[in-house]
Each structure stands twice: as structure tokens, then as C-alpha cells.
């Protein structure tokens, strides 16, 4: 039994039993993957996969039981490598971060800049995706830490910590009627075409809930996953925008105006997460604290010992 055999099984399950994709991910050949799986099955004494001819179609019952064990062995091996790197190369290595567009574009730059200055020999990888994709990248070992507002607390294998709270703003062109001195209300916002986030992104569900609670159905004419797109179409006059307040920069967004809407929509919480049981390098703890200063190493380590499924609050 060897790690490459175990990786072949894990990747086959992850990639829909497509051995071509597995071979590509493991930088080997498809026959090589098939051989690794067969040799492991022979050693174990049972089949891990249901087959249709030469194709894998699903896990067998025994395979479904074995897969979490295989994933645990591989996670342990990866942790062991990190331990070795921690003591052999304390200030060098790789840090992979998964984040939504809003976090990558607006929340992370200062932390990344400061971290790079302190750790020039650490290679940074930044992956962007939906909140669910961020969670999957953590679970699959593609990312060391993930940052998002939605979804992370829904995955029991993840340790989640609150980073910061934020609210939404309404953005409009200059001289828009909403810029008068009257109080901004949901009723007034609902009088105009709305451009905002796609469902599942950047607090969209809280925006919807706020309108529904008042019996309002806003005319959402366009949705997008990131604020830059929303701002572009507000500039074109398609409607007013509802975005995370952090996404508006008065110096850059000179053709727009922002109106604080913190009183209209519930507060959102952005969280940081990592896979439970993962050995974190010292520089990972430093990055986490650089991004969210209350999240010291002591706090993060305490969170990792909490009962699975609990969202750790600071």
C-alpha cells in the first residue's frame, strides 16, 4: 500500500470517477491510475468501485466506508509534511487562500501586502469562487484557509471563526433623487430598478429578507457575483445598486455616490475557515492575525478544539 494508490482512490471519488481527470490531477496516465486502484483493491481484498466494463461508476458499499479512512490517512501524511517544513524552513513555503470575489478584491489586499513584506519566501496562491466552492476547496485540500460570508458554517469538518462585521450601501449616480435629505427607506429603494448580488453571494439573502419582511418585492433587473459589475451597470443607468459598503471607494468610484444602508439590512459576518485537524504552519497563523487582529494563534488553536459544527465567536 502506498500514498499514490490512496490518492488515486480519493481523486476518483472527487472527480466523478473520470479516470482521465484523475490522471490529469495526479500528473500520470490513465492506465497508471487504473493499475494503482487495482493493486490497492487486491491488497485490501475487496473492490472499492462499481465498474461498467473498464469504467468506474460509483463506490461500492465497502468503498464508501473506506473512503473517509483513506482521506484521513492522506490528511495525516500532508500534516506530517507540513510539520517537517515548519522545522526545516520556518519562513518559507506556500499559503493557499480561497475567497469570494468581494473578499479577494476588497478585504484581503492590505493583509496580503503586509504578509508578503514579512514573508517574502512564502508563495501565495489566491483562489476565487462562490462560498460553496471556497468550502469545497478547503475540504479537498486545495486551500489552507478560506474566507467568505456565506456557507462556511454549514460544513461540519471546517473550523470557522468570525472575522469582521459589515453592512450594505445603496449606490446611485450623482444627482439621483435618493441623494436628497429625506430618510432612506426600503420603500424608497423599491421604487427604482435594483442591481445587486446573485443569490448566495455577499449577504443577498439578508437583502431579500429585509424587503420581504416589509411586504415589498423590489424590481431586481440584474444580478452579479461581484460589486465591480454591479457598479458598472449602475453607472450606465440601468438601476440603483446594493453592494457591500467595503466595495465602494470614494476616490475610485467618482461617477457614483454611496448611501449607507446599515439601518435597512441586517449586519453580515465574514468568517475565516480551515479544515479541522489540519496542521497550520506558523506563518499561516501570522496571516490570519494580520487579516483579523483578534484572531491570535491562541484564539485559533482554541477554536480548533471546539465541538465540530460550532461557529467560534470572538
Where are these regions (language model features)?
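Short beta-strand-centered segments that line the small-molecule binding cleft or hinge
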Residues: 87, 110-114, 132-168, 172, ...
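Central regulatory/effector-binding core of bacterial HTH transcription factors
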Residues: 92-154, 217, 223-224
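Flexible hinge/capping segments at coil-to-helix
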Residues: 157-194
Amino acid at each position: 500500500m502506498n500514498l499514490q494508490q490512496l490518492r488515486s482512490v480519493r481523486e476518483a471519488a472527487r472527480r466523478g470517477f473520470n479516470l482521465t481527470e484523475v490522471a490529469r490531477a495526479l500528473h500520470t496516465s490513465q492506465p497508471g491510475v487504473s493499475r494503482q486502484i487495482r493493486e490497492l483493491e487486491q491488497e485490501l481484498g475487496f473492490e472499492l468501485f462499481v465498474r461498467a466494463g473498464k469504467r468506474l461508476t460509483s463506490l461500492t458499499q465497502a468503498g464508501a466506508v473506506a473512503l473517509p479512512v483513506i482521506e484521513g490517512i492522506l490528511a495525516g501524511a500532508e500534516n506530517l509534511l507540513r510539520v517537517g517544513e515548519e522545522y526545516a524552513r520556518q519562513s518559507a513555503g506556500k499559503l493557499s487562500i480561497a475567497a469570494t470575489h468581494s473578499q479577494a478584491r476588497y478585504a484581503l489586499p492590505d493583509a496580503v501586502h503586509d504578509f508578503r513584506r514579512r514573508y517574502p519566501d512564502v508563495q501565495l496562491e489566491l483562489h476565487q469562487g462562490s462560498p460553496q466552492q471556497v468550502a469545497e476547496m478547503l475540504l479537498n485540500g486545495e486551500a489552507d484557509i478560506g474566507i467568505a460570508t456565506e456557507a462556511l458554517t454549514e460544513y461540519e469538518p471546517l473550523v470557522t471563526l468570525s472575522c469582521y462585521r459589515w453592512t450594505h450601501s445603496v449606490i446611485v449616480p450623482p444627482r439621483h433623487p435618493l441623494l436628497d435629505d429625506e430618510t432612506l427607506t426600503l420603500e424608497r429603494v423599491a421604487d427604482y430598478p435594483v442591481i445587486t448580488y446573485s443569490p448566495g453571494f455577499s449577504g443577498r439573502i439578508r437583502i431579500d429578507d429585509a424587503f420581504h419582511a416589509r411586504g415589498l418585492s423590489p424590481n431586481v433587473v440584474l444580478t452579479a457575483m461581484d460589486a465591480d459589475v454591479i457598479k458598472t451597470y449602475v453607472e450606465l443607468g440601468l438601476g440603483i445598486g446594493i453592494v457591500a459598503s467595503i466595495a465602494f471607494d470614494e476616490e475610485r468610484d467618482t461617477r457614483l455616490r454611496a448611501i449607507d444602508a446599515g439601518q435597512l439590512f441586517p449586519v453580515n459576518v465574514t468568517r475565516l475557515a480551515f479544515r479541522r485537524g489540519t496542521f497550520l504552519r506558523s506563518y499561516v497563523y501570522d496571516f490570519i492575525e494580520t487579516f483579523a487582529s483578534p484572531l491570535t494563534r491562541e484564539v485559533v488553536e482554541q477554536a480548533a478544539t471546539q465541538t465540530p459544527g460550532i461557529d467560534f465567536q470572538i
